[in-house]
Regions:
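Solvent-exposed, amphipathic alpha-helical segments
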Residues: 16-27
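Structured, amphipathic secondary-structure segments that form assembly/contact surfaces
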Residues: 1-11, 25, 30-144
Length: 144
């Protein structure tokens, strides 16, 4: 199959994007290594390394462990395709959606509104049997 051919319909693509973009935000202090590995399997090596570096540099990992947090995320509106291009004979999609993340422990609860911009590449790689991989995830503070 050509790497410019869709591997999923648009609804399935948007669902895939939301599921794997917010997966690293649905974590807890005890199971985060397994949860992060599962999420990372749906990213390119560059995409995951960039995300992980940012996550650690911002202190999110230390905060998760030290405060023994349970974090969960869910979209607050439907995802939309912001761009669809062909880069080096591979389809590339830029998808955006708002989501809310709540982190809590026995003493506190913190909720934040976030905006995810996800760049997804169509790939042909045994490590990505679904034919897609997240090349970049940018999450910023956002309001609806």
């Amino acid at each position: 199959m050509a790497l410019t051919s869709p591997v999923l319909g648009q609804d399935q693509l948007l669902g895939w994007a939301v599921k794997w973009a917010i997966a690293p935000y649905n974590i807890n202090y005890r199971d985060f290594p397994t949860q992060m590995n599962t999420a990372g399997a749906h990213y390119t090596l560059n995409g995951w390394n960039t995300f992980a570096k940012s996550f650690i540099t911002q202190g999110n990992l230390a905060k998760l462990r030290d405060a023994k947090l349970l974090c969960y995320a869910q979209p607050t509106r439907a995802a939309t395709v912001r761009a669809e291009t062909v880069v080096q004979r591979h389809s590339r999609y830029v998808i955006q959606f708002p989501f809310i993340q709540t982190c809590e422990n026995v003493n506190q609860q913190n909720t934040q509104m976030l905006m995810a911009t996800v760049t997804i590449d169509r790939v042909e790689d045994l490590d990505h049997p679904d034919g897609l991989a997240i090349e970049q995830l940018v999450v910023s503070s956002g309001r609806e």
